[in-house]
Regions:
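Hydrophobic ligand-binding cavity/cleft-lining segments
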Residues: 1-38
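Hydrophobic pocket/interface hotspot
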Residues: 19, 29, 57, 66-68, ...
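Tryptophan-centric aromatic hotspots in well-structured domains and transmembrane helices
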Residues: 20-23, 32, 51, 68-70, ...
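Hydrophobic-ligand binding "helix-grip"
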Residues: 38, 48-94, 100-103
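A conserved amphipathic terminal alpha-helix motif
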Residues: 101-137
Length: 137
């Protein structure tokens, strides 16, 4: 089966360091995404989401790329991989978010989760822009 990838890109008027903190620090993530817990920013570190979902940190390249895996359709064990890539642009920072791995889900679940996550990321990236353009991070 062909890979199913969700991709969105936004540009925000914030420097990379500020964006990096917002996407990799639990106290900041909670402000724009949802409550999430982890102890260390390290590959393999377990993540716990507010809805009792679980995952793990999959990629840490400071100031450049951050990724995590999460189970998006419990009880189905498949996990998708979410990756944020940061790039400095004249307007601030471009954030490109991809989520892949949907093809591991059964057809009916895959279609529903892809649609839900597409809408969800549109909303969450809007929340991230709002958070980054506030005074907080």
């Amino acid at each position: 089966m062909e890979a199913v990838v969700l991709e969105r890109s936004i540009v925000v008027k914030a420097d990379r360091e500020r964006v990096w903190r917002a996407i990799t620090t639990p106290e900041h993530i909670t402000k724009w995404f949802e409550p999430i817990r982890f102890e260390r920013l390290a590959v393999g570190e377990a993540l716990t989401f507010s809805w009792n979902g679980e995952g793990s940190i999959a990629l840490v390249e400071p100031m450049d790329r951050f990724g995590f895996r999460w189970q998006i359709a419990p009880p189905h064990p498949a996990q998708t991989l979410v990756v944020f890539v940061l790039e400095t642009v004249p307007e601030g920072t471009r954030i490109t978010m991809t989520e892949q791995g949907f093809e591991a889900l059964p057809d009916e679940v895959r279609q529903a989760r892809f649609k839900d996550n597409t809408q969800g990321w549109e909303h969450m990236l809007g929340e991230l822009i709002a958070y980054l353009t506030s005074r907080e991070p």
